[in-house]
Amino acid sequence: MAIRGVLFDVDGTLYAFEGAEEAGLHEHLVAEGLTERFASPAEALRVWRELKEEEYDRFLRGESTFTGQKNERTRRFLAAAGVVGASELADDAAAAWFADYAARKNTTRRAFDDAKPALDDLAGRYRLGVVSNSATVHQRSKLEAIGLLGYFAEPLVCSQEHGAAKPAASIFLAGCEALGVAPAEVAYVGDNYETDAVGARDAGLQAIWLDRSAGGATGDGAGVGAGADTAPDTGIRVIASLTELGSL
């Protein structure tokens, strides 16, 4: 069936978040005098990302709020750094610490180099939208900052407001409804194999897994999921760059 709409994941697909995260955390730890609390910058980043994954998963399961997971991530990270009283840090203090980190991270945030050219190519031919495991105000602000918000139909569909997170079928179907296009006529593009590609395919959309590592990319651009030696499931198309979407 012909495609009439395209939905996108944000982080790791359009927004190169890993590089901004690493630079922002390093700068923040220097400013806070915490760099010596870890064996190396790489170890600090490893701890930060491990805690982020755990606390963000709690948010996605509905066990914490979007703000709450940031506060708890901050407490646990500072506790890992040996900061006295970190575990009992008040919400406003934890939120202020995280806000300072985010401000530093945001100075280096950018879209992937292939994002704008791909969206320019698609915008005149398809309805474009966003389905993201995040909060709407957060993702709208981010997309505006990296110059991509204007490409997408409103509402942006995000898990906090929708009430369920990818890979639940309902959030993909809500994205299709926002476009006004039937699921079978919508492609979903994301960098996480299980959450994005398998979830979209199982919801009845045309699934496209962005695996930047397939094109030789590493680090900030690597896709997440199946692994280099694993063949994708039936019904999942693999691309190494968003520029390949021109052949939809």
Question: Would you name each region that the model predicts?
Answer:
Residues 1-50:
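Active-site neighborhood of HAD-like aspartate-dependent phosphohydrolases
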Residues 1-4, 19, 116, 120, ...:
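Asp-based, Mg2+/Mn2+-dependent phosphohydrolase catalytic module
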Residues 15-16, 106, 110, 184:
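Residues in soluble alpha-helical coiled-coils and helical-bundle/repeat scaffolds
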Residues 22-26, 30, 45, 67-75, ...:
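An amphipathic alpha-helix signature
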Residues 23-27, 47, 73-76, 100, ...:
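Alpha-helical elements of Rossmann-like donor-binding domains used by nucleotide-donor carbohydrate transfer enzymes
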Residues 31-37, 80-88, 147-151, 180-181:
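Short helix-capping segments at alpha-helix termini
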Residues 46, 50-100:
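A metal-dependent, Asp-based hydrolase signature
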Residues 63, 68, 91-92, 99-130:
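Short, acidic loop-to-helix structural element flanking the phosphoryl-transfer center
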